[in-house]
Amino acid sequence: MSTVGLFHFPTPLTRICPAPWGLRLWEKLTLLSPGIAVTPVQMAGKKDYPALLSLDENELEEQFVKGHGPGGQATNKTSNCVVLKHIPSGIVVKCHQTRSVDQNRKLARKILQEKVDVFYNGENSPVHKEKREAAKKKQERKKRAKETLEKKKLLKELWESSKKVH
């Protein structure tokens, strides 16, 4: 038998691209699995709550400061970091999640709206309710994992004891 036959592949070894060339990484992820792919911009506002208190632009104080963090000179020299203050409550939000000032302004307003709603409504706020539900789900998952671990230990003990008998 020759060595050529051992290395014969039925299909060419080429990379198959799942999406057209011009798409960015998060767009490719969205095409592959639309429910899973989340960009950092979408993560900032977390969810869109229609029942939140509305913000009055007259009660807001907005500043643009220089950025920080990874990105080097392009990030550190431009003033695209938004500092938004709600004057009546004194809540301050700093947003520097994107390089765009407009996107940072929108994100800062969403985050401030959530924080102001929690400040005034407390435990009745939809944001606070969601946090409680998430904590409850986490606790349930932890409890199930602990029960599963105990069952596995018991099964292992039974298996080892039956092994010693034979």
UniProtKB/Swiss-Prot annotation:
Keyword Transferase: no
Positions of post-translational N5-methylglutamine modification: Q73
Domain of life: Eukaryota
Transit pept. (range): 1-35
Residue span of region GGQ domain: 57-121
Chain positions covered by the region annotation Disordered: 122-148
One Gene Ontology biological process: rescue of stalled ribosome
Molecular-function GO term, any one: ribosomal large subunit binding
Pfam family name, one: RF-1
Annotated Gene Ontology cellular component terms: mitochondrial matrix; mitochondrion
Motif segment (GGQ): 71-73
Biased composition (Basic and acidic residues): 126-137
Tissue: Expressed in all areas of the brain tested.
Coiled coil, from the record: 127-160
Family listed: Belongs to the prokaryotic/mitochondrial release factor family.
Protein purpose: Part of a mitoribosome-associated quality control pathway that prevents aberrant translation by responding to interruptions during elongation. As heterodimer with MTRES1, ejects the unfinished nascent chain and peptidyl transfer RNA (tRNA), respectively, from stalled ribosomes. Recruitment of mitoribosome biogenesis factors to these quality control intermediates suggests additional roles for MTRES1 and MTRF during mitoribosome rescue.
Subunit: Interacts (via C-terminus) with MTRES1 (via S4 domain). Associates with mitoribosomal S39 large subunit, peptidyl tRNA and nascent chain.
UniProt remark on domains: The GGQ domain interacts with the peptidyltransferase center (PTC) of the large ribosomal subunit to trigger nascent chain hydrolysis.
Noted disease: Combined oxidative phosphorylation deficiency 7: A mitochondrial disease resulting in encephalomyopathy. Clinical manifestations include psychomotor delay and regression, ataxia, optic atrophy, nystagmus and muscle atrophy and weakness.
Name of the protein: Mitochondrial translation release factor in rescue
